[in-house]
Each structure stands twice: as structure tokens, then as C-alpha cells.
Design a protein with these regions (language model features):
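Active-site beta-strand/loop architecture of penicillin-binding DD-peptidases
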Residues: 5-104
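Short, gly/Ser/Thr-rich active-site loops of penicillin-recognizing serine hydrolases
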Residues: 87-131
Length: 131
């Protein structure tokens, strides 16, 4: 299993097709892919008659952090063509998750107080709720 995790890490962080998903400070691992549309040639001909441009579906699955993952995200981008486009969507979701986690940890640390070795959270103030 570790070989698979290492390979997925490389896809994102070592110049692989998932490089657009890389995030500084977060070990995101992932895999790009495409899914061929059924009868793509026939569909393209039909789409061209209607002024549409059909491409293969693109997907990306990613998880973070590399060790002890907390989040898994899959993005499927209809007619995206290549998985790199879906990788940027996953990157943004993972970044939002860790940004929010950091804000919550900071907020809780600011509210905590310790009495006799026991940690308590003070009730939030109106000011602290606006952050």
C-alpha cells in the first residue's frame, strides 16, 4: 500500500500530471485520469453540427496529508479533456479545508484557559465570532 501512496505523492509533488494540485506545506497525494465517452467519434460529429466541442471526461482524486489522511476529494469535470483541470478543483477544496482547520484551531487556542491543569474553553465573545 505504501508504494501506491508514494506513487500518488509523486503524481502531485514530483512533476507528475497532478502537479497543478500541489500545495505548499500540505502533502497532497493524487491521481489524474480521463474517462472516454461512449461513441466519442459519433458524439463529436453530432456535437459539431450543434456547435459544441466534446472532450473526454477528466477526473482527479486526492487526499491529504500523505500520512494519516484527513480529507479525500474526487472531482469529475465533464468534457474537461485532461485530469489536470480537475486537479485544480481538488487543490482548492483541500486548501479551504486546511485553512478553515487552522482558523478554528487558532480561535479555540485564543479562547482556552487552563485551571489546575484542566483546559477549558471560554464562551465566545461577539468580537471573536466575527473572525
Amino acid at each position: 500500500m505504501q508504494d501506491v501512496v508514494d506513487a500518488m505523492y509523486g503524481v502531485v509533488n514530483e512533476g507528475g500530471t497532478g502537479a497543478p494540485a500541489a500545495l505548499p506545506g500540505i502533502e497532497l497525494c493524487g491521481k489524474t485520469g480521463t474517462a472516454q465517452l461512449a461513441s466519442l467519434d459519433k458524439s463529436k460529429a453530432e456535437a459539431a453540427r450543434h456547435g459544441m466541442n466534446l472532450k473526454e471526461n477528466a477526473w482527479f482524486v486526492g487526499f491529504a496529508p500523505r500520512r494519516d489522511p484527513e480529507i479525500v476529494v474526487v472531482a469529475l469535470f465533464d468534457h474537461g479533456g485532461v485530469g489536470q483541470y480537475a486537479a485544480t478543483i481538488v487543490r482548492d477544496v483541500v486548501k479551504s479545508y486546511f485553512d478553515k482547520k487552522t482558523r478554528l484551531q487558532t480561535w479555540n487556542q485564543e479562547r482556552s484557559t487552563t485551571v489546575a491543569g484542566i483546559s477549558f474553553l471560554r464562551p465566545p465573545t461577539a468580537e471573536s465570532r466575527t473572525r
